Structure formats: C-alpha cells, structure tokens
Amino acid sequence: MNGSLSQHDQERLSTPYRDGPPEETVYLVTGASRGIGRGLIEAFLQRPKSTVVAWLRNVRTATPALSALTVAEGSRMIIVQLNSDSETDAQAAVQTLREEHGVTHLDVVVANAAMATNFGPASTMPLEHLQAHMMVNMYAPVLLFQATRLMLQQSKQQAKFVLIGAPISTITNMHDYSRAPLTAYGVSKLAANYMVRKFHFENKWLTAFIIDPGHVQTDMGDQGARLMGRPQAPTTVADSVAGICARIDEATKETTSGHFVIHTDGSQLPW
C-alpha cells in the first residue's frame, strides 16, 4: 500500500520521546543488511541514547556499509550474525549480546528477515519450497521471540515485538492477491501472523503486532512488482521506514497489540 506520511509522523520519526527516553533504548532488527532492515537500523541510530542491534546473515560483507551510518550522541550499533534458517542461531546471538556486549535488556525487537523465492501455483508447489519459506518466515520469528523473551521482560519501557508482515497473507483480502504467484510466501507469513497474535494473548506485559510496510522498493518488493507486470514497487524504503517507526513509537498494548496495522496511518488490516 502506498501513501505519504502525515507531518505529525515525520516530526516524530527522530524524536519519539518529547521529554527524552527514560533510559537507553535497545532496538534489535533482523535482516538488517539491506532494504527495510537497513533503513530501520539507520533510523534508530539517529536517535540519541540508543543501542541498535543489527542481526544479519553475513557480518563480514555488511559491516562496512552499516559502519558508515550516522550515529547520534550516546548511541551505538552492535552487529551480530544470525541465519534465519538456523534453529539455534537466535539463542546463540542472545548469548553473544549478553556476554560480549553487556546488553541486559531489549525494548523493541523487529522480526524483519524474510524470503520469497518460489513463484508458482499452489497446485504444483514443491513441498521443499514451502518448508524453506516456513523456516525463514514463520519458524524464525518464533525462535526469535523465544530467544529474546526474557530480555524483553527486562525492559523498563513498554516491550514491543514487531513482525514486518505482508497483506498477501490475509485470508479476507485473498481475492485482491489471487494473481500473485506467491503461495509459499503468503501462507508462511499468515502462519507468522497467527503466532505474533498468540504472543499478544499469552503475554500481558508485551505489545506484539504486525506492520504492513507497504509494497516497498526492495529487491523482494521490486521482484514482486515485476511478476505483476509493473516496473517497480510504489513505496520507497524511506517512506516505509518512517511509517514503521511512527507506528512502533505510538503502539500500546490497548490500541495496537494483537493487530495487523498499516504503516501509513495505523489503520488495521483484516485477518
């Protein structure tokens, strides 16, 4: 979904706390080497007194570009390896945060890493493609929450677990995306939505929700656009990231948790 941000959202992007944060805010983003993930790392680093944890697959190749990002006063970035197709990397990465970097809590965790590589009809989709998508798009966010849950509970702010979702995963609106040959991607994101909503109900202390980032000009987004006969996706990474940050900042347990919200204005998508 494309759309421009309100002036209010743009003003809030770099100043989420008008009176200053109560303490250092710790953000964690997966899939941080490019696209939306990299954009979120850049945005969070511009906030004072922030620790921004970038979890990504290839630390060696991604570090030079990430290290060149502007860092606000009192802020820092930590880069940790995480393979989303691993069942053990999330726990190991949390241990690295604690033991090597002295991180004792997390305030915001963004499950952004995803894959979309199979583009055929559901009727002939090979099972191995579905399994691969379920591992990265559903199992990995579950493993991420399980690994970070205790550190989120240590937050002195309102702990937030955020899944970057996709409107193609909604059952109600499936007719709008019926031509898209993205069955494995859609059903794996749908399963992830269920789990995040389940986290909301099971954890009264947690704000857990899904954000539709728009159809974004990333490698994955542009590839999807071409499959639909369009030259590129309509939403820039900058606009998507600004909206995502605004929705995270304003999210509360009462108004946002357990819902699937649109990045531009926070309105809810149907399941």
Swiss-Prot record:
Disulfide bonds: none annotated. Induction: Expression is stimulated by gluscoe. The promoter contains a CRE1 element (5'-TGACATAA-3') required for cAMP-mediated stimulation of expression. Expression is also positively regulated by the cluster-specific transcription factor aflR that binds to an AFLR1 element (5'-TCGGCCAGCGA-3'). The promoter also contains an aflD-specific element called NorL (residues -210 to -238) and required for full transcription. Natural plant compounds carvacrol (CR) and trans-cinnamaldehyde (TC) strongly reduce the expression. Zataria multiflora essential oil reduces gene expression. It catalyses: (1'S)-averantin + NADP(+) = norsolorinic acid + NADPH + H(+). The keyword Membrane does not apply. Residues 1-22 are annotated as: Disordered. Belongs to the short-chain dehydrogenases/reductases (SDR) family. This is Norsolorinic acid ketoreductase. The lineage of its organism: Eukaryota, Fungi, Dikarya, Ascomycota, Pezizomycotina. The gene is aflD.
